[in-house]
Curated annotation (Swiss-Prot):
Record lineage: Eukaryota, Viridiplantae, Streptophyta, Embryophyta, Tracheophyta
Organism, scientific name: Daucus carota (Wild carrot)
Source superkingdom: Eukaryota
Biological process terms in GO annotation: carbohydrate metabolic process
Enzyme class, UniProt record, top EC level: hydrolase
Family statement: Belongs to the glycosyl hydrolase 32 family.
Role summary: May play an important role in phloem unloading and in stress response.
GO CC, any one term: extracellular region
Pfam families in the record: Glyco_hydro_32C, Glyco_hydro_32N
First-listed, main subcellular location of the protein, grouped into a coarse class: secreted
EC numbers: 3.2.1.26
One example GO MF annotation: beta-fructofuranosidase activity
Protein name: Beta-fructofuranosidase, insoluble isoenzyme 3
Keywords, sorted A to Z: Cell wall, Glycoprotein, Glycosidase, Hydrolase, Secreted, Signal, Zymogen
Length: 583
């Protein structure tokens, strides 16, 4: 569970006190992407629900705080999404498992919370977990229960089952009396959480639970023959030094020969596995691709898969606590991820809501076998409205051209850029890999003249570019003549407002540019820019809060600030409508 706890006041009349505290605190410490932790306090009531930066087609409740996506699954004709939710305010606290259902992953109906503190084994909290479909099409939820108050927060692993299996909405859930399934971890009771979807192999059900010891990230493996009595394996399935607490682990098979997803219990020759962990100390995630030894219950990353902080990420931006599930209807694996706010806590209280789930993504193994690729689920295309098509638009150095005819504040933009030569690619310094993203994108940003790039999109831009969020590429050549593509999403000019967290996000990616083309798709939605770049291999999500580039005053441009001319071969853009139902 992505735990972000903050100030607690009992009524709206305390807002003035909170404002004073926030002013002092933010001026001393600044604002960060995950918000600060105040262990002595629990919740704040929302003052109002403000809409100016509210998303139009991303998943979010009508009001209040959300964080981790939990237990996604498909059951009796409906997709289910549970999520960590504060029903009493727009900051972390009072967490329950909220529950929504959908026929298409786009339109959502909110139901009553499915799981909330009510038993001794979860009386202090119901934190993140997963769903598993047992034989006979019977769903079960595994989740972390908190059995002691702050500061200990001792954690156990529980399960819940539907009260009525014939109800496709699964409105009511029961917590059997034989909980907890797994008791408090004696070595680190406050860092033992977020059970995975279980898989069946060798006569046993198996699941992972995230943990840490002496700053070593750990994924413990548990086995059960009946899903009721669980025993820990003598050794973790995998560990890694200097990575800290592993939150929200995810472990699943991928096919080396097909884009189709696989059920978690699917095993076979050639099948690889993905282990993803969310790093509590950095608020980023990384994943490895490797081999699962089913007999010894070991996972070994491939030698081409970096294991640790420098590992591959699903998303190099504002993306955390992700969870995948197998969709048996369309035979695909779908990825959910949470994007926190990048404004201040006082902003969240004033607007009355915080947090979104990013657009669900289909995810599969690249043919190289070295990384995953992702794409928005096809259902999102049903929201497309008015459209514009740009063809063969040349961009010389310093040129930006507006993309008109769509609502730029709420759009889907899919572009292919090309260039005639790679000769102007600048030399790549290997040390850049280790630099902070802000430093890389500052020194090689959208306004800094280069050779091959920077070029890309200026999203959520004001007419005269006082505000804009650039998403762009810059191409380098390493000593071995291999190309390195830098992709950035840079929020530092996204808003004239002060007191915001305006990070630069970046990712370097190896991509085949033999055809001298590179792709970029951005889903733009008022305060979020989700970008899929470099042939679906590099993804960056940003939260931004423009003051001028809002509603009909938002603009979209293509640009080039490199000496090598760029051509927009194809650009297809659509205004995006809102779903007919959103919680």
């Amino acid at each position: 569970m992505a735990r972000t706890k903050i100030l607690v006041f009992s009524s709206d009349s305390s807002l003035f006190l909170l404002s004073i505290f926030s002013f002092i605190f933010l001026n001393i410490n600044g604002v960060d992407s995950t918000h600060r932790v105040f262990p002595e306090l629990q919740s704040i009531s929302a003052v109002d629900v403000k809409l100016v930066h509210r998303t139009g087609y991303h998943f979010q409740p009508q009001k209040h705080w959300i964080n981790d996506p939990n237990g996604p699954m498909f059951y009796k004709g409906y997709y289910h999404l549970f999520y960590q939710y504060n029903p009493k305010g727009s900051v972390w606290g009072n967490i329950v498992w909220a529950h929504s259902v959908s026929k298409d992953l786009i339109n959502w109906i909110a139901l009553e919370p499915a799981i909330f503190p009510s038993k001794p084994f979860d009386q202090y909290g119901c934190w993140s977990g997963s769903a598993t479909i047992l034989p006979g099409n019977k769903p079960v939820i595994l989740y972390t229960g908190i059995v002691s108050p702050d500061p200990e927060n001792a954690q156990v692993q529980n399960y819940a089952v539907p009260a009525n299996y014939s109800d496709p909405f699964l409105r009511e859930w029961v917590k059997p009396d034989n909980n907890p399934l797994v008791g408090v971890h004696t070595e680190n009771p406050s860092a033992f959480r977020d059970p995975t979807t279980a898989w069946f192999d060798g006569g046993h059900w198996k699941m992972l639970v995230g943990s840490s010891r002496k700053h070593r990230g750990i994924a413990y493996l548990y086995r059960s023959k009946d899903f009721k009595k669980w025993k820990r394996s003598p050794h973790p399935i995998h560990t890694k030094a200097e990575t800290g607490m592993w939150e929200c682990p995810d472990f699943y098979p991928v096919s080396p020969r097909s884009e189709d997803g696989l059920d978690n219990s699917k095993m076979g020759r050639g099948i690889k596995h993905v282990l993803k962990v969310s790093l509590n100390s950095t608020r980023y995630e990384y994943y490895t691709i490797g081999r699962y030894n089913r007999v010894r219950d070991f996972y070994v990353p491939d030698n081409t898969s970096v294991d640790g902080w420098a590992g591959l990420r699903y998303d190099y931006g504002n993306f955390y606590a992700s969870k995948t599930f197998y969709d048996p209807i369309k035979k695909r694996r779908i990825l959910w991820g949470w994007a926190n706010e990048s404004d201040s806590q006082i902003d969240d209280v004033q607007k009355g809501w915080a947090g979104i789930q990013l657009i669900p993504r289909r995810i599969w193994l690249d043919p190289s076998g070295r990384q995953l690729v992702q794409w928005p689920i096809e259902e999102v295309e049903g929201l497309r409205g008015s459209e514009l098509h740009m063809r063969n638009q040349k961009l010389d150095m310093g040129v930006h051209v507006e993309v008109t005819g769509i609502t730029a504040a709420q759009a889907d933009v899919d572009a292919t850029f090309s260039f005639k030569s790679l000769d102007k690619a600048e030399s790549f310094d290997p040390e850049w890999i280790n630099l902070d993203a802000q430093d890389v994108c500052d020194s090689m940003g959208s306004t800094i003249q280069g050779g091959l790039g920077p070029f890309g999109l200026l999203t959520l831009a004001s007419k005269d570019l006082e505000e804009y969020t650039p998403v762009f590429f810059r191409i380098f050549k390493a000593e071995d003549q291999k190309l390195k593509v830098l992709m950035c999403s840079d929020a530092k000019r996204s808003s004239l407002a002060e007191g915001l967290y305006k990070p630069s996000f970046r990712g370097f990616v190896d991509v085949d540019l033999s055809d001298k083309k590179i792709s970029l798709r951005s889903l733009i939605d008022n305060s979020v820019v989700e970008s899929f770049g470099a042939q679906r291999k590099n993804l960056i999500s940003s939260r931004v809060y423009p003051t001028l580039a809002i509603y009909n005053n938002a603009h979209l441009f293509v640009f080039n600030n490199g000496t090598e001319p760029i051509t927009v071969d194809n650009l297809d853009a659509w205004s995006m409508n809102s779903p007919s139902e959103m919680n």
